Amino acid sequence: SLAGSAAHDVYAPCAVADLAARGYDYWALGHVHGRTVHAEAPWVVMPGAPQGRHVNEPGPRSATEIRVADGRIAALAEIPTATVVFERVEARLSAEDAAPLDAVALRALEAAAAGLGPEQTLVARLAVTGDAATLAAHRRHADYWRARIAETAAEAGAGWIERVDFAPAARPAA
């Protein structure tokens, strides 16, 4: 776990210098599911996981390919592998935007999926935000809007909805 991570407990503490002192060319450190290259001489890599498992493992996932030439590591390459990409997506309602919630949500989902390849599917946890009055009006019919958003996203090929949460917009800092 090197110096640790905000998302994980320190479970195998060590430092890059400790690993470098061992004389190996490559260290593949496991358990942490996000890919990180910590050093290149020697290579110290947390290769990540080839597929996110839930919305708390967002973004593209990959495997690390090691290219060897003349018995030495010549290069590392990140190879995308995930067919499902989890993301948290915000659909912001405003009194100025007359579009219905499903259209606002679809725009947000399409923006989140814009960088995905044709073989990848977005699975989104949608947070509906906005002013309190607008949210309250939609929250009264939350079950309808959840179903409508999921149907609209599926019809448009914009991915799958894992969950829809209605929450107020963040309050301005005091």
Residue ranges and their predicted role:
Residues 81-174:
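Accessory, non-catalytic peripheral segments of nucleic-acid enzymes
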Residues 1-95:
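Functional cores that coordinate and move charged inorganic groups
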